[in-house]
Amino acid sequence: MMSKSNQDIATPMNFIREIEIFFKIKFKYDMAANHDNNRVEYYFTEQDNSLEMDWPLDGWCWLNPPFGKLSQFIPKCKEQKDRGCRIVTIWPLSGDFNQIPTWKESFVSIIHGRIWPEVRGVMLCQWDLDTIKGVRGLRWDKKQLTYCWE
């Protein structure tokens, strides 16, 4: 599902549910949403500005940041993880992985298979104090997530 701007690509709801099933978690907060693309019970809009607040600690946070603000959300995720937040983020795969220091800060899952028509590849980063750091591959076939390599 696309909103009016490519900055606001909505994550397909069935993909969100599969992430919850796969990681055995339940998202409570969407940290970068709008009234048309929110995916969980509580969400924060651009006007709420989640970049300027402490994120909730009482549930898992989902983050699909606007493409134009990726670089602002990376340090925010690290800051909030260090506070104790449990976060799963989705990032577009790009040629420059040096811009995404999450390789050292989170458990990264490379997603094989298209989620949106416009985006060829994405990775999930699970920011959690108890998560083992590393990289694994997952396959998305429009119905479920499965391991394809670890």
Regions found by a protein language model. Give the residues of each.
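Class I S-adenosyl-L-methionine-dependent methyltransferase catalytic core
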Residues: 1-150
